[in-house]
Amino acid sequence: WLLLPFYLIYPGTAILQVLQAIVIALGVIPLIFIGKNHHMKWGQLILLSAVYFFYPVMSAGCSYDIHENMFLPVAILCLILAFEKDSLWGIVVSTIFVLSIKEDAAIYAAFVAIYMIFSRKMYKKGIIVLMVSIIYFFGAVYYINHFGMGTSSDRFNNVIASGDGNVLGIIKTVLVNPAYVFGQMFCEEKLNYIIVVMAPLLFLPIWPGKWQKVILLGPLFLFNLMPDYEYFSNIGFQYTFGSATLLLYSAIVSIQELNKSPKTKLLAMMTVSSILFFMS
């Protein structure tokens, strides 16, 4: 709906592709403010912006069709920024922004809230956002299943036991047969995907540090590695936008943790790596 006025003025598929790229690019604005919160100087912020623009996940996903996931980077980054600023209204508006994108966008908001609860001890605001996200998610799924065309839970059939065709079925599989789930997540095709997603960030999201960073990997595991739906683990499509946004934030957190390594050097290496993968 936000893009409809532009489409009315310039109807056509080309304008939709351009608008999608612009929407994704807007994510750099809250990203810069997040970088400033982590004590980055302007030169470092420029490098961080370059990483964002050339990050293959963001750039490659712009070239195929149009998808509501394009709003995830800017929405998630705004929510993270609002939490870091401890802005009540910012958190409220950003949470609404994220939840309004699609039903499963609530999962990203939930993981951000969980991370803020444990890493920044923002118990009250974090728990409220978490509960709102969970209630919204199950409410939206119920509505779609009963009054719409149903959710796309069939894309998770490989991790949902027969007769348990819902989100709870995924949780059951993880608890009952974790070895099977592990095999689904780290097969050869998924390992190639992990390299493409992580290498431009120098694998910083999984660099040893504070354990809370593991929380930010949740959507990657859930949406991109667990399902066998091939497009979920293909950066040429938009299904990695949300997960990659959290990975990028995790990389920023890791850079701040690595006090002995100059931020400029790490960001420069990330920029070069992103450009190389972008060109490959």
Residue ranges and their predicted role:
Residues 45-54, 81, 95-99:
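Short helix- or helix-capping micro-motifs
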